Curated annotation (Swiss-Prot):
Protein name: Zyg eleven-related protein 1
Comp. bias regions, Low complexity: 205-220
Self-association state and partner proteins as the record states: Interacts with elc-1. Part of an E3 ubiquitin ligase complex including zer-11, cul-2 and elc-1.
Function in brief: Acts as a target recruitment subunit in the E3 ubiquitin ligase complex zer-1-cul-2-elc-1.
Entry keywords, A to Z: Ubl conjugation pathway
Gene Ontology CC: Cul2-RING ubiquitin ligase complex
Organism per entry: Caenorhabditis elegans
Pfam families membership: LRR_Zer-1, ZER1-like_2nd
Gene name of the record: zer-1
Chain spans, region Disordered: 58-78, 195-221
Keyword NAD: no
InterPro entries in the cross-refs: ARM-like (IPR011989), ARM-type_fold (IPR016024), LRR_dom_sf (IPR032675), LRR_Zer-1 (IPR056845), ZER1-like_C (IPR055142), Zyg-11_UBL_adapter (IPR051341)
Length: 895
């Protein structure tokens, strides 16, 4: 399979390193009150905190409390407090100057917001208030009271309209909106009361006499609290305080595009009030506005405006004449998210009129409209000029090809042969889809459809070879990051990722980004079965657990949660159990304890119990027991969790129901073996029913010795506890020991094992137990077998873990049985052969027999025993249900 190279890794810049160092001192008041930073470092540090509060914002939105106030803190109170702290620190512009003030995603109040703006009023050139909450039209009054102006500000971006629409008082039903006579307005006395209340609450009021404009300060007339007012004074909007703004981005929130204020006040009046102070405006974004009528409010900007973005503004056919008067336009975007709102009565004529009128146009987006449709008998304008080759009739009057043309979701327009543009967004080929991902990354409505096209493209391919997987990967990741709360978009993105990541040689950072995106999507949309399945399928393409160790705990918690929420979806269950089993392999005890602490053992047992009740033995059950085997390996805490959850009862039930399922029985006995190795827990196995099962399995050697070997190991540990603990049993201990020896003697010493030991300590502890000759026999056979079949690996384990002296003691002790002595000599001979092979001249024979050699445990030896990585057949069985047929399950969305 061919792969595309990932983007190169980049070392952190000095600026990032420096900002990281300063960030660590944020709670050091003495440091933060004295530090002085240059603008670039102050900007970078502020951006770090912005990223931090936006990460917290990805959690569930706080539910608005109804009724009287309570003392309970908001769920996001910690994040709000952090934002306030950051705003207060940066309100000292002398030490922490800012030129670009980006407050995206912040939750603030008017007071602290105005403090920050006022501090940097004379230096900021860009102001970004995207998704800022808590700011109201009261901020305009505060700015007015403090005479704050922004002479350097050239760019404003915001999604909340309060700062630009001003206060719109709601009227009672039946009162005309133009009737203001005999209305009452609070006067100075009421203002003084409000100021006193604010100061009692610990807030500094910007409306105190010392901070008011001189005209207000000089007004000492005694006014009643309520006085008739024919012309109430309204504070100027923020645009009136920044007359040099050239770029104004005012996209409304799609979910709140129709508000009461908008219904009560003509949109033309609102926009005129916003735009009239901006005599130098060049770029204007009014995306998602509605009821814009003919947009005559744009006429005063006809000589300056070069970019007009009207994405998802409905019924734009009313505004075409006024748009055509904007003759300086270079960029025009009239695209829609839905075709229904982008229908023009005479589309070909309309597009032709725009092209003829806007002679400087270089970028045009008409996605999800009918403007690129073919002409009809009543809609076929005459060609104004013949300059370009095009199969789109409405563009025939172009003087030169466009630099960019948006044609996504314009029926088949992006598939025609002649398109007069250098770059095109559409769905005809990979280049068009990549361009669409780039252009519509902020537009959820269009982006969802683009991601669906991406899914189709990278799953089924195209007539041309696909070569831009890496770009697609990073664009899809960005889309999922920007629109985490949109479940349909997350589903489409996760499905695309499934097919893209298999063709990219991802570097470390990209792997982390992909895993984080999948986990975040799954975390926020846990109830969406398709989303959860897509994410789990994509995770199966990573090396588990290596690629997820950086977020190991989070994934474990999520997978357990998936088992709880989606226990009826068999495919999802199979994938999750496989992932959990993979996570339990090849990790150290601490991480296994973590997984156990999140309830994974209990959840897996619950799934196994469901399967048993349904009398079904499938992948979920088999891999579930494999997970339990791995998660309890050398981890007594997890063994105890298994026992406390009545795991032994379930073991007995599953054995009785499915005793012919060899893989299942093998996994179950591996788990029981882990429990048998724990001295404090082994007594719970001392029941006649369990011992009879273990003894019966000693003779199970149909395909391999694994089940018989595991059963003998369990019994070997049980009989090692001595005669006393067996007195309560009806099964005779001596008879059990004899059966262990008989089973062990029947195994072929050269049998290759499907087990991967990383420590021999549990086995070596049985060697000195002369009161339990069967335990010795099983232990020494295991050592002889492993050092014979894989001496290069296991001889070092015996020597380094102190096994040589124990074996020599067995050989020399008179009460050792002949078979045990023979096996012990075999192990010692294997060790000598391996050592001589490595250093044939440097190791004298007498040293090879020495029992005084020091015991040393190397760093590569751990206390964990796990399934053999070399067990190719077993591994393929587990992998089969992950890799086969999954192409039919990763879905972009349910149509």
């Amino acid at each position: 399979m061919s792969h595309t190279a990932d983007i190169p890794l980049e070392a952190p810049t000095l600026l990032k390193l420096a900002s990281s160092s300063v960030q660590s001192q944020i709670n050091n008041d003495e440091y933060m009150e004295t530090v002085i930073l240059p603008v670039p470092l102050s900007q970078e540090l502020f951006a770090r905190f912005r990223n931090k509060w936006n990460i917290h914002n990805h959690g569930p939105a706080p539910v608005e409390h109804l009724g009287p106030p309570t003392d309970e803190p908001r769920p996001d109170q910690g994040n709000i407090d952090m934002i306030k702290q950051v705003f207060r620190i940066w309100s000292d512009s002398t030490r922490l100057p800012l030129e670009k003030l980006n407050l995206t995603g912040a939750t603030v109040d008017d007071q602290i917001f105005v403090d920050l703006l006022h501090a940097h009023a004379h230096s900021i050139t860009e102001l970004d208030l995207t998704n800022v909450t808590g700011v109201t039209d009261l901020s305009n009054a505060y700015l007015y009271a403090r005479s704050t102006h922004f002479p350097m500000l050239t760019s404003i971006r915001m999604t909340s309209m309060d700062l630009v629409t001003g206060h719109q008082p709601r009227r009672k039903n039946g009162i005309a909106s133009t009737e203001f006579r005999a209305l009452f307005m609070l006067g100075e006395e009421a203002l003084a009361e409000a100021r006193g209340q604010m100061e009692r609450d610990g807030l500094r009021s910007p409306l105190s006499p010392s901070s008011q404009p001189s005209s207000i300060q000089s007004d000492h007339q005694s006014l009643d609290a309520l006085v008739p007012c024919d012309s109430p004074v309204e504070p100027p909007l923020i645009t009136a305080r920044a007359p040099n703004v050239k770029r104004l981005f005012l996209p409304r929130c799609p979910a709140k595009r129709t508000t009461i204020d908008e219904e009560e006040q003509n949109t033309h009046v609102i926009l005129t009030k916003i735009l009239s102070p901006l005599q130098q405006l060049e770029v204007l974004d009014l995306s998602y506005w509605s009821k814009t009528d003919d947009m005559r409010c744009l006429q005063p900007l006809s000589n300056t405006l070069t970019c007009l973005i009207l994405y998802d503004v409905p019924d734009l056919y009313h505004a075409v004449p006024n748009i055509c008067h904007m003759t300086e336009l270079r960029i025009l975007d009239v695209s829609q998210s839905n075709r229904d709102s982008g229908l023009y009565p005479h589309p070909v004529t309309t597009l032709n009129k725009l092209i003829v009128s806007l002679k400087y146009l270089t970028h045009l987006d008409i996605s999800s409209t009918n403007l690129a449709t073919q002409p009809s008998s009543h809609d076929n304008p005459a060609r104004y000029r013949e300059s370009v080759r095009t199969d789109i009739c409405g563009l025939q009057s172009l003087v030169r090809p466009l630099k960019y043309l948006g044609l996504f979701n314009c029926e088949s327009a992006s598939h025609v042969r002649e398109i007069p543009a250098e770059v095109v967004s559409g769905d005809a080929n990979e280049d068009q889809v990549i361009t669409s991902l780039q252009m519509y990354k902020d537009r959820a409505g269009l982006l969802q459809n683009v991601l669906n096209e991406s899914y189709q493209l990278y799953r089924f391919g195209n007539s041309n070879p696909l070569t831009r997987h890496t770009e697609a990967l990073h664009l899809v990741l960005e889309a999922m990051h920007r629109h985490l709360a949109d479940s349909t978009l997350q589903i489409a993105g996760s499905a695309s990722l499934f097919y893209i990541i298999r063709k990219v040689d991802m570097n470390r950072d990209t792997k982390r980004r992909v895993v984080s995106a999948l986990l975040s999507g799954m975390e926020v949309h846990m109830e969406e079965q398709v989303m959860v399945r897509n994410c789990c399928l994509s995770l199966c393409q990573f090396e588990i657990p290596q690629d997820i160790l950086f977020d190991y705990s989070r994934l474990a918690v999520l997978l357990v949660s998936v088992l709880q929420h989606h226990n009826a979806d068999n495919l999802t269950q199979r994938i999750v159990v496989f992932l959990l089993n993979s996570m339990a392999c090849h990790v150290e005890g601490d991480q296994k304890v973590q997984v156990g602490s999140y309830g994974a053992i209990e959840m897996i047992l619950d799934q196994i119990a469901r399967k048993h009740t349904a009398n079904v033995c499938d992948d979920v059950m088999e891999v579930g027991w494999s997970f339990l085997w791995n998660i309890t390996d050398e981890t007594p805490v997890n063994c105890e969790l298994f026992l406390n959850a009545n795991g032994l009862d379930l073991f007995q039930k599953c054995y009785e129901a499915f005793k012919t399922e060899r893989e299942l029985v093998r996994n179950m006995m591996g788990l029981i073996g882990n429990i048998a190795e724990v001295d404090e827990l082994r007594s719970q196995l001392m029941k006649d029913d369990y011992v009879k099962i273990f003894c019966a399995l000693l003779e199970s050697q149909e395909e391999s010795i694994e089940i018989s070997y595991n059963s003998a190991g369990v019994l070997a540990h049980m009989v090692s506890d001595g005669e006393e603990v067996w007195k309560q049993m009806t099964v005779c201990r001596n008879e059990v020991m004899q059966r262990i020896v008989e089973a062990t003697s029947s195994w072929k010493l050269a049998t290759r094992r499907f087990i991967n030991y990383r420590s021999f300590r549990p086995i070596l502890r049985l060697l000195p137990l002369y009161h339990a000759y069967a335990s010795q026999h099983w232990a020494v056979w295991a050592l002889a077998n492993l050092t014979t079949t894989d001496g290069e690996k296991y001889c070092a384990y015996v020597r380094d873990e102190g096994g040589v002296p124990l074996l020599e003691e067995l050989v020399s002790n008179a009460i050792t049985t002949t078979d045990i002595r023979t096996l012990a000599n075999t192990v010692l001979e294997n060790i000598r052969n391996v050592e001589n092979k490595r250093n044939p001249k440097s190791i004298p024979a007498d040293l090879a027999h020495s029992s005084n050699s020091p015991t040393f445990v190397p760093s590569y030896v751990s206390d964990v025993e796990e399934e053999d990585e070399g067990d190719v057949e077993a591994d393929e069985e587990v992998q089969d249900f992950v890799n086969v047929d999954f192409d039919d399950y990763a879905l972009p969305m349910e149509y």
